[in-house]
Structures are given as C-alpha cells and as structure tokens.
C-alpha cells in the first residue's frame, strides 16, 4: 500500500495511542499538517508558541504514556528546547517532529530562512542530542525502519526523541511493506542482583523503600505495590515522584524530604540498615539540600539503567526487569514502622481574615476527589501540595527536578486533553502564570474544563525565600488576573472568582462543585511573604547550597 511518509508517521503514532498532536504551524511543516488534520483518529492542537506546545505534550504524555508535537525548523524547534529538556530530565516520552527544508536545499547548503546563515542543517539536531534519547533524519528509504526505532526508544527509555523531517520527504509516497511494530524489550537476567539484595535484606533489622518518579514514568505502580505487599517493607516516597506509591496502603509511611520530613519518618529512614532506592533520584529539592543522614554509598540504587550496590554497578539493566526480579524474592519484614497519618477533614476555621497558605492547602485537601488530577506548579504551590494526602486513583503532576516555572499551565492543557473525563486541578502562582499565560486561550478554544487556582502573592516567592526577600527583581507587575479569561475570549465559558478569605474560598469551592461542566478560574490573594512551611526551609537550604 502506498502512503506518504507523513501519513506513515502518523499511522505509527496512532498505533501507540497518540490522538492529539501539539505544535505551531510553520512553512516547513504546513503540508505535513494537512495529513494530520485530514485524519479522524488524530486531532491537531495548535498552541500559541512552541514552548507551550512542549509543556502541553509533556502533560499529555504523563497521562497517555506518550505524546507528539510538531514544530518548524530552527526558530520553532529551538523554542521547544526548554520543554523537551524537562521531559528528558523527568523521563516523559515526547516525539518532537521538526518540519525541515527540502533535501535539495540542505544538500546545496543554501542560506535559507530560520537557519544560522552558514549553510549547515545539522546544528539544531546536534543541540537536541543531549536532551533526547535518540534522533532520526527521515528519508523515504529509511522511514519504515527509523520511525519505529525512535518511537520504540521513546517508550523504552521514557524520554523524548527528535525527528528531522524534510518537507519533501513528508510528501513523498512510499510502499508500506510491513505493519508498524515496536521493538521488543530484551530482558536481562537479574538473578545475581536479586541475590545480593536478598542477602542484604536477610541481615537487616530495619529495611525501607524510597521510591520516586521513575515508577510514574514506567507505570510500575502495581508491580511496586505487589512487592511491598508481599514483603511488608515500608515505603517513603520523594516529592519528586509524588503518587509513585499508593498512599492508602498500610505500608506507606509518608513523604521523605530529608530534614523536613516528620520526625518518625526521618528517623526510620535515616537509621535504616537496608535502603532500597526504587525509581527515585535523591535530588537537592527532594531532600532539602541533601539533608539525609544515611550514607548514600550504602543505598541500593534500583533505577532504569542504574543498579548500584556496594562496588557493583550495572548500567545495562532496566527498571522493569529489576522490579520483576524483586517480586520473586521470598522475604518478609517483621519490623514495625511509623504509619502514615492522613490529615483530618475540616481542620481549619472559616472566617473573614486574610487567607493563609496553611488554610488554603487544608481546604484543598478536603476539595480533592478520588479521580482528580492535581497539577502543582514549581513554587509555593508545589511545596504546599506535595504533602497533600492522595487517594489511590489520584494523579499528581509536578516538575521538581527540571523546575521550569510556567510549565504547569500548558501541562494542564495536555493532561486535560489526555483524559477529558477526569477533573484537573491546577495550583499555580502569579509569577509562573505570567510566563505561559497564553495557554488559557488554547484551553478556551479546546473547550476543556480544568479548575485553575492562581495564588496572587505579588511576585516570585521561591526566589524571595532563597535570596532578595524584598529585592525589586523578585517583584512582578500586578495583573487583574480574573479578567484574563475574558481577554482570551472565554467570557461566557469560564467562571471567574476573586478570593481573599477562607469564608470566600469555601463559597467558591461549593460553586465549583455545583458546576462541573464549566472551566473555573480562581484568583486567590495572599500575603507577599506567606509561604508553606516547607518552602521556607527549602529556601534556606538552597541559599546555603548556593554559598
């Protein structure tokens, strides 16, 4: 069967579950976009800029398992670099497709627009090499091998890939000789690794599991819970990877964030003689500036492409195989451990005093429903939200490793489009919102219905807590935030609110509950120096780390 290369590429993406494609049109991808919009199984979601498109693709992939975006050559693909780098850091598979000049133009080294004017056409692909797990230059001859290869790599590594697609190649017909198939996973024998772990557990008095974001990336929640249920080893999770473990499990202890953790959890983890680090990375923000008290060299590192125990290191083993091996261990822990204490309902007073961060998050705890997706911006929102108690079927999205402010607004666009039937709660601050605010326009056009909470506390609170509490560079221009939906054409679609007190907030939450078929935009005013308790401590840790 004859198909254009662009059609074949979209067939492959559809086969792995992609039904939305994000991006921005440009002259080197326009005829390729014709092939996208002509399909019934794919929807083109045009974004206001490529950065927002990359963030939206990331949010979509965190629910769907993979995403695709399209940019034009040079100016478009470089605008997406920040978002793609974040997806690489946090292991989110995004297929970044760049529509490029024709092969004839490239081979002749012509000084084409959107180039650097040097006659080279591999500069941007080289820039992507460090932030994608693999790259491909598509031709009619290699399309049926290269396209499946890079999609398979994205899914196996849970990281972005880059596809360079000259526009004449996208329009060229090829004879499709085989159906699309993902490359098979080559399983490794991990029996030696498991024997080492078993010996450590058998000699341990106080074992513990620290888990994190790779469990979310690889979708290994059931496998991890099976291992924990069989062995009775307690689990602490990092903020980097919130939702990796079922917080309703009797073996869940809570969030471990170094010196900031509850004393019982902190003492148990720090004094453990057998720490299994499963799918987690002990970053500065996740551990309050590396404030853990255990010896990092004694930790058993069980990560994708990284098994480390004592002097043994293996970088050619998958997290999937390692967790499958753990589930074959015949071990049961009999040591008692601190149990997670879920917060009490309605643990706050309603009054007409200015709303505080503490009360805001307590009220948010009561507001969360079983199936909600909670998206927390890297700022006051994240550092308050990662202590929220999740239900088993909640989904939590943050970006604490890459930490690019503004990420969550377009990411919410992506996550809501990935599953329109789940309520999305976005918690974001004013400074972050100003970076990517145009995503509201796309949300309105796509007629999605997230609930957006904007903390208006007049500036960059995280930065204030690190340095320059009253410095003018941490100030931002005050906007009338509740008018933004009207500016972006959503006056009739979006319910807007202005909140100053807990009494007002409670009334708004009840109105939101009563209108699930509407998008809601809530501006929540708070004091400029108010912050979640843990953010105050993290700020001090970062200030110390920076010298």
Description of each model-found segment:
Residues 1-330, 370, 449-452:
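N-terminal alpha/beta PP-like core and its mobile active-site loop of ThDP/TPP-dependent enzymes
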Residues 97, 107-118, 258, 310, ...:
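Thiamine diphosphate
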Residues 61, 154, 228, 269, ...:
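N-terminal cationic-hydrophobic initiation segments that often serve targeting/anchoring roles
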Residues 6-18, 24-27, 32-37, 340-421, ...:
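Active-site diphosphate/adenylate-binding microenvironment
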Residues 138, 294-380, 490-547:
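Phosphate/pyrophosphate-binding active-site segments
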Residues 103, 169, 380-382, 528:
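Active-site/binding-pocket entry motifs
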Residues 63, 114-156, 271, 335-347, ...:
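Conserved thiamine diphosphate
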Residues 155-156, 202, 369, 390, ...:
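Short conserved AdoMet
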């Amino acid at each position: 069967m004859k198909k254009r290369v662009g059609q074949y590429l979209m067939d492959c993406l559809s086969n792995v579950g992609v039904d939305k494609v994000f991006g921005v049109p440009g002259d080197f991808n326009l005829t390729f976009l014709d092939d996208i919009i002509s399909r019934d199984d794919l929807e083109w979601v045009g974004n206001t800029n490529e950065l927002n498109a990359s963030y939206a693709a990331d949010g979509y992939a965190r629910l769907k398992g993979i995403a695709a975006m399209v940019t034009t050559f040079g100016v478009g693909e470089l605008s997406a670099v920040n978002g793609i780098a974040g997806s690489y850091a946090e292991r989110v598979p995004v297929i970044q497709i760049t529509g490029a000049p024709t092969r004839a133009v490239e081979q002749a080294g012509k000084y084409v627009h959107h180039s650097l004017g040097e006659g080279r056409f591999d500069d941007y692909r080289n820039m992507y090499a460090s932030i994608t797990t693999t790259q491909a230059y598509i031709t009619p001859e290699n399309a049926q091998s290269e396209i499946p290869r890079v999609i398979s790599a994205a899914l196996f590594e849970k990281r972005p890939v880059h596809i360079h697609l000259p526009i004449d190649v996208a329009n060229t017909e090829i004879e499709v000789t085989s159906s699309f198939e993902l490359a098979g996973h080559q399983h490794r024998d991990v029996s030696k690794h498991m024997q080492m772990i078993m010996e450590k557990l058998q000699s341990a008095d106080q074992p513990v599991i620290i888990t994190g974001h790779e469990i979310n990336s690889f979708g290994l929640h059931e496998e991890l819970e099976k291992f924990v249920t069989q062995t009775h080893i307690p689990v602490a999770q990092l903020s980097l990877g919130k939702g990796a473990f079922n917080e309703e499990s009797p073996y869940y202890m809570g969030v471990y964030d170094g010196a900031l953790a509850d004393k019982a959890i902190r003492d148990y983890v720090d004094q453990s003689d057998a720490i299994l680090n499963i799918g987690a990375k002990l970053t500065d923000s996740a551990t309050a500036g590396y404030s853990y008290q255990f010896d990092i060299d004694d930790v058993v590192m069980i990560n994708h492409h990284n098994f480390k125990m004592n002097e043994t290191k293996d970088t050619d083993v998958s997290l999937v195989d390692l967790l499958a091996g753990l589930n074959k261990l015949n071990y049961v822990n009999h040591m008692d451990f601190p149990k997670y204490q879920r917060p009490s309902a309605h643990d706050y007073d309603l009054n007409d005093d200015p709303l505080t961060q503490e009360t805001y998050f307590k009220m948010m705890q009561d507001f969360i429903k079983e199936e909600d997706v909670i998206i927390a911006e890297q700022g006051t929102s994240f550092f308050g939200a990662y202590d929220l108690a999740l239900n088993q079927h909640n989904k939590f999205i943050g970006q604490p490793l890459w930490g690019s402010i503004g990420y969550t607004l377009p990411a919410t666009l992506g996550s809501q489009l990935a599953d329109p039937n789940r309520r999305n709660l976005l918690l974001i601050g004013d400074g972050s919102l100003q970076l990517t605010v145009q995503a509201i326009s796309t949300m309105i056009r796509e007629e999605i219905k997230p609930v957006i909470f904007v903390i208006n506390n007049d500036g960059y609170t995280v930065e204030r807590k690190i340095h320059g509490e009253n410095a003018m560079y941490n100030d931002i221009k005050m906007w009338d935030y509740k008018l933004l939906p009207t500016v972006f054409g959503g006056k009739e679609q979006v319910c807007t609110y202005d909140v100053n007190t807990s009494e007002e907030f409670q009334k708004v939450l009840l109105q939101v509950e009563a209108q699930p078929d509407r998008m809601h935009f809530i501006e929540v005013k708070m004091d400029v120096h108010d912050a979640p308790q843990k953010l105050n401590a993290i700020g001090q840790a970062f200030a110390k780390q920076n010298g």
